[in-house]
């Protein structure tokens, strides 16, 4: 556990975009593989906030073609990821599949090699996912999934902790062409090769409705004005009185979150500028949901002279002109 982890636990750097993923990514090394280190979780146990409950299953509204894309990704996950039937990978992933997880080389062949190394295929292929997503949606050629992972709080065995992992896919020509998640690079994993793919925003071609544009403006105001520039006075206007925060190291409700942000030592109110301090690499709407993804560079744990890129996510559900829930 490095010094940056200690800093995150002390000041929860979600608000500088190094985020809660600084410790939850240690629980989830790679796609579909939530891992728990008891010693590590014990170290962060004192930072867990009480009152968090499991999320209810929610599905974003989709057009028929988008529903087809979602079903395609879930079928791939069940057969290739969960059951490790890598002989089926070519049915789902493009040969030049682009991988943004820093622990897995890019390309379909590398994906097959990686999942073969995890063990034999499961026979027969299960009818259902081992851990179905609690949030799922598709917008244009993007498919997004949020998974919930339940653990026991080492400081209180009666209390459960709910941690979330995020996966984003881009579909092209009927195949999975690109994948992003929030994994942190592990020491000893293959050398990270930066992607030369076009920025993810390039593929965001669906025009949002007027209501979705309003939702995006609300999400932007929260993430930019409140999170980046520290204007907590906007919270009561932006967040519902019944707001739920699903990040387990943050207070679960609106008032708690307001006081939490105010207490951060580096989060005094600043003059709001037109530009973001760290603009999202991708943002899109999906009915009441706003999906945002940021990219950030980190030192490679295997080679401090090199850097790698990690992705950070926030999913905001907005109804009635207020943010109702956030997963991050």
Regions found by a protein language model. Give the residues of each.
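N-terminal secretory signal peptides that target proteins for export/translocation
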Residues: 1-27
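C-terminal and inter-domain tail/linker signature
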Residues: 46-328
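Enrichment for repetitive, rod-forming helical segments
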Residues: 11, 35-36, 177, 324
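N-terminal leader/targeting signatures
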Residues: 1, 14-17, 36-37, 162, ...
